């Protein structure tokens, strides 16, 4: 969500809302109040959308971090077990079987 585009779109939507409200009510005071309420609701929606995007990104980073830790721990366990040969060590370029 590109902020300047969102704000310009918000201003356009509020202007259209204000024109329609004034056309329906004919009252400038009522139009101003209803447009202000609409602006607050749009801002709350934008704030919730940004919070959702941040939450989603944080959740994805935590998931990737936990997978990375699991893979690192698994590789460390492969290296430490005495009877088990790690495929990672066999695939090294300086290994004699190459």
Swiss-Prot record:
Source taxon at top rank: Bacteria
**Compartment(s) where it occurs, according to its Swiss-Prot or TrEMBL record:** Cell membrane
Membrane topology value: Multi-pass membrane protein
Q: In which pathway does it act?
A: Glycan metabolism; exopolysaccharide biosynthesis
Region annotated Disordered sits at 73-98
Task: List the coiled-coil residues.
Answer: none
Annotated Pfam families: SyrA (PF11089)
A single Gene Ontology CC term: plasma membrane
Has UniProt tagged this entry with the keyword Transmembrane helix? yes
Q: Where is the chain membrane-spanning?
A: 6-26, 35-55
Q: What is its main location?
A: membrane
Bias (Basic residues) occurs at 86-98
Keyword annotations for this protein, in alphabetical order, are: Cell membrane, Exopolysaccharide synthesis, Membrane, Nodulation, Plasmid, Transmembrane, Transmembrane helix
Cite a single GO BP annotation.
Answer: polysaccharide biosynthetic process
Q: What does this protein do?
A: Inhibition of exopolysaccharide synthesis (EPS) and nodulation ability (NOD).
Would you tell me the protein name for this molecule? Answer: Exopolysaccharide production repressor protein
What phylogenetic lineage does the species belong to? Bacteria, Pseudomonadati, Pseudomonadota, Alphaproteobacteria, Hyphomicrobiales
Q: What's the gene?
A: exoX
């Amino acid at each position: 969500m590109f902020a300047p585009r969102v704000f310009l779109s918000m201003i356009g939507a509020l202007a259209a809302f204000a024109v329609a409200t004034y056309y329906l009510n004919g009252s400038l005071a009522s139009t101003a109040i209803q447009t202000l309420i609409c602006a607050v609701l749009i801002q709350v929606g934008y704030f919730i959308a940004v919070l959702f995007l941040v939450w989603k990104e944080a959740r994805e980073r935590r998931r990737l971090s936990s997978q990375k830790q699991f893979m690192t721990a698994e590789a460390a366990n492969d290296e430490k077990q005495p009877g088990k040969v790690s495929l990672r060590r066999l695939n090294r370029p300086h290994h004699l079987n190459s």
